[in-house]
């Protein structure tokens, strides 16, 4: 039987000092010997997705203590990618993922916690905590802050739905009046919560459900809805149940590495492709798989992208549906249910929402779907749960409303979630492309690509940084038929692998959204749509071919064939490569870029791998 990790600091006379300190935190005589559950919160007033999390740790703690545990909360950092976007602040976003993972590891291991609840929400916080949880491999439950309500406003007497990207595009579009732009800005983000579309934050919170590490509704239940309160309480109860299974019953199925195994990663990626999730999820799943020692790679993602249909289309890929609509249609469990009916899901994997009593099928995703898939459940409480809807009242308060949709969206032919027969497309919403531009692959969110752009041939317009690209787009340098190439923005080259939401938004605002392509060794916001190809690997700073592209080069993109090709002969490419090598210390570096890179970012760049490895640390540089 495994011994409580916390016994290291609570048992024996030699730990009298440690016990004295535990007592000073509120631990009583009869508490010693109970499991100590760490609560990793990420409350901050900087981020709308986290501004309401201040009291969530206490809520989880109350359930833990009622179930017989000791709850101890700590906080970690959270960067708002939207606020950090478009300036030097974005250099810090992806590196913050590693800091979050490390900070959770440091706190949990320094204090010998027995189990963990992760209260996350936005872009790098859920992935960072996920990496830490799989690194630590102690019982864990994830519970996020939830998505914000979609914005709504009237323009030209027509009610429209809005999100953050609409505000950015309107602000850059000279054809939109100052009055309408201000109206959109004030309406785009009406409540607390992660941005309302299938952007990175919501994509990752959905994926934790598919990985088996969070409860049904985690990815889709609105932050403002009163029903979300129960998710926090249940997270506390579930983590205690998992801790008891592991420490009292020697049940290793309660550990995250036995839940999030290879099959679970396939389930998560299958969901991601089916719902057209953010391309950033590829980066984060690859990173999490490395922490879990799961051999899940770009090759697996490429294979799956050819098999999985696109069953759920959500903003930014369409203005019609947002996360509140996904929830009404059954949330993640609704999508997984449809995938199960197509034979594309592993349902024999363990899940934190299910009790494992040793009987066949218990504790698995199959039993969770039986209860929570709205198309098969007989549980009226579950149906009531998925009818939770928006109130349309601006607020920063969690659990502030209890509005319901009049009915569930069970329309699998024309609704938000479709059956395979009526899929938005028979190939999913993400694809891996490869070719001489990206020998190790690159990612495109096909859910956001217009059908007319699935194949594209154009002339390269090369920029050495996002800043130069923005200036070029706004200055009229980019014209229809161009392939905008933004390089030296990868994990090493940026450093930090900036998101390119501003360049794509500005292309849209100038009417070039369907007339141009954009490729980069950087990445894209979950809010990006259009022919935007990111994660080019190897990156320019690591000797990738993207560094050798010249203005006017012909670039051929063929998404159905999964190819991206620089139409330059091997002889010419080799000559360019030799010329680059001849530059010595200046080789594989941006020409003329003016950018301050702090010591912290330089340290990150020294160990960062390219995107095809998840942009994690290069372990070969750390291990003997």
From Swiss-Prot:
Q: Please give the superkingdom of this protein's source.
A: Bacteria
Sorted alphabetically, the keyword list is: 2Fe-2S, Amino-acid biosynthesis, Branched-chain amino acid biosynthesis, Iron, Iron-sulfur, Lyase, Magnesium, Metal-binding
On this chain, the residues bearing N6-carboxylysine are 124
Metal-binding as a keyword of this entry, yes or no, is yes
Q: What is its EC number?
A: 4.2.1.9
A single Gene Ontology CC annotation of this entry is: cytosol
Q: Which residues bind [2Fe-2S] cluster?
A: 122, 195
Q: Which cofactor does it need?
A: [2Fe-2S] cluster; Mg(2+)
So what does this thing catalyse? (2R)-2,3-dihydroxy-3-methylbutanoate = 3-methyl-2-oxobutanoate + H2O; (2R,3R)-2,3-dihydroxy-3-methylpentanoate = (S)-3-methyl-2-oxopentanoate + H2O
Q: How is the cofactor bound?
A: Binds 1 [2Fe-2S] cluster per subunit. This cluster acts as a Lewis acid cofactor.
Q: Name the catalytic site residues.
A: 525
Q: Which NCBIfam families match?
A: ilvD, PRK12448.1
Q: How does it assemble?
A: Homodimer.
Q: What is the protein name for this chain?
A: Dihydroxy-acid dehydratase
Report the source organism.
Shewanella baltica (strain OS155 / ATCC BAA-1091)
């Amino acid at each position: 039987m495994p011994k409580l990790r916390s016994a290291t600091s609570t048992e024996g006379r030699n730990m009298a000092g440690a016990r004295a300190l535990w007592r000073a935190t509120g631990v009583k005589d009869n508490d010693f010997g109970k499991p100590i559950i760490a609560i990793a919160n990420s409350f901050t007033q900087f981020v709308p997705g986290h501004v309401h999390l201040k009291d969530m740790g206490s809520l989880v703690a109350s359930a833990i203590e009622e179930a017989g545990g000791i709850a101890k909360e700590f906080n970690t950092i959270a960067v708002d990618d939207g606020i950090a976007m478009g300036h030097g602040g974005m250099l810090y976003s992806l590196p913050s993922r590693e800091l979050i993972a490390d900070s959770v590891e440091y706190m949990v291991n320094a204090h010998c916690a027995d189990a963990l609840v992760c209260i996350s929400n936005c872009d790098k916080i859920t992935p960072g905590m996920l990496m830490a949880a799989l690194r630590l491999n102690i019982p864990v439950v994830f519970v996020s802050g939830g998505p914000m309500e979609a914005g709504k406003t009237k323009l030209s007497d027509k009610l429209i739905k809005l999100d953050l990207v609409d505000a950015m595009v309107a602000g850059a579009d000279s054809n939109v009046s100052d009055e309408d732009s201000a109206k959109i800005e004030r309406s785009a983000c009406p409540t607390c919560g992660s941005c309302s579309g299938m952007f990175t934050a919501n994509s990752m919170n959905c994926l934790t459900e598919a990985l088996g590490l969070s409860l049904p509704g985690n990815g889709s239940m609105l932050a403002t809805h009163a029903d979300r309160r129960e998710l926090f309480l249940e997270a506390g109860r579930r983590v205690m149940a998992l801790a008891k299974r592991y420490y009292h019953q020697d049940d290793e199925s309660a550990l995250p590495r036995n839940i999030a195994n290879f099959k679970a990663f396939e389930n998560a990626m299958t969901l991601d492709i089916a719902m057209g999730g953010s391309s950033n999820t590829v980066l984060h799943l690859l990173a999490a798989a490395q922490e879990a020692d799961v051999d899940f790679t770009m090759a697996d993602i490429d294979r799956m992208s050819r098999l999985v249909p696109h069953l759920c289309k959500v903003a930014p890929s369409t203005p019609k549906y947002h996360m509140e609509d996904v929830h009404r249609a059954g949330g993640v469990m609704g999508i997984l249910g449809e995938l199960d009916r197509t034979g594309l899901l592993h349902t024999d994997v363990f899940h934190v929402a299910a009790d494992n009593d040793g009987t066949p099928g218990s504790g698995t995703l199959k039993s969770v779907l039986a209860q929570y898939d709205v198309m098969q459940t007989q549980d009226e409480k579950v149906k009531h749960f998925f009818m939770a809807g928006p109130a349309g009242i601006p607020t920063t308060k969690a659990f502030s409303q209890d509005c319901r949709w009049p009915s569930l969206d069970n329309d699998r032919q024309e609704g938000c979630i479709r059956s395979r027969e009526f899929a938005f497309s028979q190939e999913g919403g993400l694809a891996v492309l490869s070719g001489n531009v990206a020998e190790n692959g690159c990612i495109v969110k096909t859910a956001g690509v217009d059908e007319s752009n699935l194949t594209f041939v154009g002339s390269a317009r090369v920029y050495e940084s996002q800043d130069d690209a923005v200036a070029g787009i706004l200055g009229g340098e980019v014209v229809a038929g161009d392939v905008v190439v933004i390089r030296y923005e990868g994990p090493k080259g940026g450093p930090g692998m900036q998101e390119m939401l501003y360049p794509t938004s500005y292309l849209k605002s100038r009417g070039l959204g369907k007339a141009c392509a954009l490729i980069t060794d950087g990445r894209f916001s979950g809010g990006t749509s259009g022919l935007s190809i990111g994660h080019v690997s190897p990156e320019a700073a690591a000797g990738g071919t993207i560094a050798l592209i010249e203005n006017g080069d012909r670039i051929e993109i063929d998404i159905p064939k999964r190819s991206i090709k620089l139409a330059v002969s091997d002889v010419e490419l080799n000559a360019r490569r030799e010329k680059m090598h001849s530059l010595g210390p200046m080789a594989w570096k941006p020409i003329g870029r003016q950018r301050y890179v702090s010591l912290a970012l330089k340290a990150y760049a020294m160990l960062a791998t390219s995107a095809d490895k998840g942009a994690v640390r290069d372990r070969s540089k750390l291990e003997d």
